[in-house]
């Protein structure tokens, strides 16, 4: 690659007007389009999970989770006692089942999706009222998903575990 080709590719990438697209710059654009398509597909899988959770659609949730799923709750949180959860059954029993039994009106509200390759980070909030304590939960979260072949293979939760523990622990 000549210095001229590199310079033209750099100017083209910077948005310089009137600079012709070179053959050297086209593969980079093609790779960017493929990455964007992959990001969008993986984000769609994660969005489907949140929609299914909100609808109480366990069959769809189960279909989005890989059989060899590894799910990790935030350390020191009320559901981290069984970390790492292996497979959808462990997640349904150890997390979803317990939350359903312990909270009234529990909701997971994703606000921002940040896809990058096979990972999708999601920023949002949890809300609900603990049945035993009557305390309301309103905690931020970051969820980091790894998606492979249209299935969620890994999940890592980050949240305000101190708030969770305050809400679930009787005075």
Residue ranges: model-predicted function:
Residues 118-126:
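A short hydrophobic beta-strand element
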Residues 128-138:
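Short, cysteine-centered beta-strand-loop-beta hairpins and adjacent loop/turn segments enriched
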Residues 46-49, 61-62, 69, 91, ...:
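Hydrophobic pocket/interface hotspot
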Residues 67-112:
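A solvent-exposed, acidic/Ser-Thr-rich amphipathic alpha-helical stretch
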Residues 140-166:
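Short beta-strand edge/turn micro-motifs at domain boundaries
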Residues 107-108, 136-142:
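Short, surface-exposed coil-to-beta transition loops
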């Amino acid at each position: 690659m000549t210095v001229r080709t590199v310079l033209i590719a750099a100017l083209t990438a910077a948005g310089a007007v009137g600079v012709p697209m070179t053959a050297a710059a086209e593969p980079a654009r093609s790779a960017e389009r493929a990455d964007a398509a992959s990001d969008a597909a993986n984000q769609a899988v994660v969005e489907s999970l949140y929609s299914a959770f909100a609808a109480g659609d366990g069959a769809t949730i189960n279909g989005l989770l890989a059989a060899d799923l590894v799910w990790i709750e935030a350390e020191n949180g009320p559901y981290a006692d069984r970390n790492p959860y292996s497979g959808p059954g462990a997640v349904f029993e150890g997390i979803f089942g317990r939350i359903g039994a312990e909270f009234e009106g529990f909701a997971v509200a994703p606000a921002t999706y940040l896809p990058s390759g096979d990972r999708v980070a999601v920023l949002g909030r949890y809300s609900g009222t603990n049945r035993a304590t009557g305390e309301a939960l309103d905690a931020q979260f970051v969820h980091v998903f790894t998606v492979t072949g249209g299935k969620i293979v890994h999940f890592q939760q980050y949240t305000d575990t101190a708030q969770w523990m305050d809400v679930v622990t009787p005075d």
